[in-house]
Amino acid sequence: MKVSRHTKILEIINLKDIETQEELAEELRRSGMEVTQATVSRDIKELKLIKVLSSKGRYKYATISPTESFLSNKLVTIFAQTVLNVDRVNNMVVVKTISGSANAAAEAIDSLNLDGIAGSIAGDNTIFILSRSEETAFNIVQKLKKMINE
């Protein structure tokens, strides 16, 4: 069941610009599959789908190439090895790294395509991430801390 659902998801996102999990769930239902938004969310994670800018200027789900996946995994490893601390101040996330590593760690964060990030800036050993809300900042901190096993 899961394999056929994953295959159908990949087929759908290659044929249509799917912007939300709910849209994807609706397309799956139209093809005769009973799914919940939670199931679709898990499938998106397992398939490592990302959101990319479509030709219409809107974000849609897409797959990443094996090269991008390999590079992304390398960056996540660098992130885990160089980050010392992750903290939140209101809607801003502050990431402290070992000296000279902030740019590489910021590249890793960018490769994650996390929702709700308005922008980021990296210095020598500090990254500032501006999120769209305090709740989003909290969620980003949780995800980043999980990556460094904190």
Curated annotation (Swiss-Prot):
Q: Which keywords does this chain's UniProt record carry?
A: Amino-acid biosynthesis, Arginine biosynthesis, Cytoplasm, DNA-binding, Repressor, Transcription, Transcription regulation
Q: Which family does it belong to?
A: Belongs to the ArgR family.
| Name of the protein in its database record | Arginine repressor
Q: Translocase as a keyword?
A: no
Q: Domain of life, per the record?
A: Bacteria
Compartments annotated for it: namely: Cytoplasm
For this UniProt entry, the molecular function terms from Gene Ontology, in alphabetical order, are: arginine binding; DNA binding; DNA-binding transcription factor activity
Q: Mind listing the GO biological process terms from this record?
A: L-arginine biosynthetic process; protein complex oligomerization; regulation of arginine biosynthetic process
**What broad class describes the main subcellular location of this protein?**
cytoplasm
Pathway membership: Amino-acid biosynthesis; L-arginine biosynthesis [regulation]
HAMAP family from the entry? Arg_repressor
Function, as annotated, reads: Regulates arginine biosynthesis genes.
Matches recorded under NCBIfam families: argR_whole (TIGR01529), PRK00441.1 (NF001680)
- Which Gene Ontology cellular-component terms appear in the entry? cytoplasm
